[in-house]
Every structure is written in C-alpha cells, then in structure tokens.
C-alpha cells in the first residue's frame, strides 16, 4: 500500500515529498491507469513525477509547456474563441496560404509546418488559455482555408482540392479581409 509507513519511509528516503502536488498528480495518474491496484517501485514514481511541474500540472514532452492536456475537468470548457496574438494569426495565415498553394488545396500531414505555428502560439499564451488558444487558431485556420478554396473556385468553377490552383487566385486575399468576413476576391468579368 502506498500509504503504509514502510512505503512512505522508502519514498522519503528517495527524496520524494509525498505532500507535493507533483507527487499527488503522479500518484493520481498511476491509480487511474492501474485501477487502484498498483505494483511499482520508487524509480517508476520518480519517472512519472518528472512529467509534472511543482503545481501538479502535466508537462508536454514536445514543448515543455503545461496547460496542454485535455482532462475530464476541462474537456467541455476549452472550446471557445479567445483573443490570440495577431502575429500568431498572421503566421498561420501565411503558412496556410503557402501550403494550400504547394499542396493544391489538400492537407498533407507529412509536410505541414502547422505544429510549429501552434507551439509558437502556446508559448505566447498563459497556461490556462493554451487549449482555448489552440482551438481558436483551428477556427481561424479553417476560415483561411475556406476563403482560399472559394477564391480558387471563383477563378475556376470546376476547381477541387488536388487540382492545380489557378494562377493568381489567392493574390487578393488578406488575413484581415478573411477575418472581417470580406473575402476581398475580385471576380473577373
């Protein structure tokens, strides 16, 4: 048992503060994964504790940031639009446009650089806003790609994803025009 005096002595001897939020978060994760029946050792506990900060928040191994875990507590509350930096929206707009042109309107998970745009955004946001910021960025990204597809269809009504984008089709589209609801697409007569 984790709370037996002999186990507690071993943990303390190993330098583990059993009152810390970090320890409690690791123990909670172990209990959840082990359904309460745990067979473990001190090193396994230390390894798991290294995945949490002093506040007991999970540290994303790719970014080193907290606030990026979807949990039972936040699962239904992070999907709302929040204010995100204009520089991040601009970075996503430029990348989405470049990738839309390079991939003929398809999404290519092998070549995209989207993750770096999201990671840059997360670094600019407070921990408690990171999930909502990511969700907000997804909404902007979808809006940008939709505007690009509509512009390609204005130039060539038969265009569909995978076909070459008509030359100049995206030239008149700005991030500001998409975000304000105006696509700023000139229709050639």
Located regions from the model:
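Type III/flagellar secretion export determinants
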Residues: 1-189
């Amino acid at each position: 048992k984790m709370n037996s005096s002999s186990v507690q002595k071993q943990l303390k001897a190993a330098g583990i503060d059993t009152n810390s939020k970090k320890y409690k978060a690791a123990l909670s994760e172990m209990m959840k994964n082990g359904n309460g029946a745990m067979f473990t050792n001190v090193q396994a506990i230390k390894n798991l504790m290294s995945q949490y900060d002093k506040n007991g928040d999970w540290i994303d191994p790719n970014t080193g940031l907290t606030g990026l875990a979807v949990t039972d507590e936040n699962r239904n509350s992070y999907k709302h639009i929040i204010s995100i930096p204009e520089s991040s929206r601009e970075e996503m707009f430029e990348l989405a446009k470049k990738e839309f042109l390079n991939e003929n309107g398809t999404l290519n998970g092998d070549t995209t650089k989207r993750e770096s745009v999201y990671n840059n955004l997360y670094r600019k946001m407070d921990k408690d806003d990171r999930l909502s910021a990511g969700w907000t960025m997804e909404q902007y990204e979808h809006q940008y790609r939709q505007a690009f597809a509509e512009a390609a269809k204005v130039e060539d009504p038969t265009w569909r994803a995978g076909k070459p984008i008509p030359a100049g089709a995206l030239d008149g589209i700005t991030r500001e025009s998409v975000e304000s609801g105006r696509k700023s697409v000139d229709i050639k007569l």
